[in-house]
């Protein structure tokens, strides 16, 4: 006989709420609307309310651009922490944390495949990995992509999505500005097209190097493009900047960008430009840039 079980009523088990994923709902930076992430995927992370372009993860960016399957190129290994840098935490610890969070080795991926049936190589940066900052690994990636383009006689496309140079690598990071500039110039000297795609943001050392050297500059609607940010400029010159300053549309009006497109228009626009620059016919009559729906 157990008096606890016989005379004391068992307590009702406390129910615990189910855990909700952190990224289930996203707030639109443009209009403040709460957006269901599952619905956002259908629009390639463009707000259906105001049309604001939220940042797109690297793998989704590559999926958006290529016709179907694409092959990622293996990038040369670089020394992880040549300066033994430490601020509030070790640089090596930061790298480990971002690799775990993004699943990527660094802020760049280089892939080859077809866009509208035209073979090309794409080097894309990822803001989710340390703000897409350009260090030695990113520099190596751009150089690798350029060398691959020259070797296989195909166009080079870069997709900038970066806050600039990586401060944890100091002068070694700034050196990549010269290296990437030389790399894309090599592509041009070989008579091959180089298309620079700019997304939000394209700033700092990336905008001051390869990102602004394309034969054609294509920017996503509303993206920030510049060297220093508008807030820094206003604090320095102590003047209010013009409305829309450093946005894609402003740069197009002032001759720094050739084409401004929405995300859904990006691939069809690239196909048209590639077909003109390579003198190739587009293999597909219509290029779809919407995510494929799962077949039932």
Locations of regions flagged by a protein language model:
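Terminal-region recognition feature
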Residues: 1-195, 201, 213, 244-296
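Gly/Pro- and small hydrophobic-enriched strand-loop and loop-to-helix capping segments
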Residues: 214-235, 259-268
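Short beta-strand/loop segments at the ligand-binding rim of alpha/beta enzyme cores
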Residues: 187-198, 222-224, 229-238
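Short amphipathic alpha-helical segments
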Residues: 170-171, 208, 230-231
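Peripheral, non-AAA+ core regions of ATP-driven protein-machinery
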Residues: 221, 241-244
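Gly/Ser-rich catalytic serine loop of serine hydrolases
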Residues: 199-209
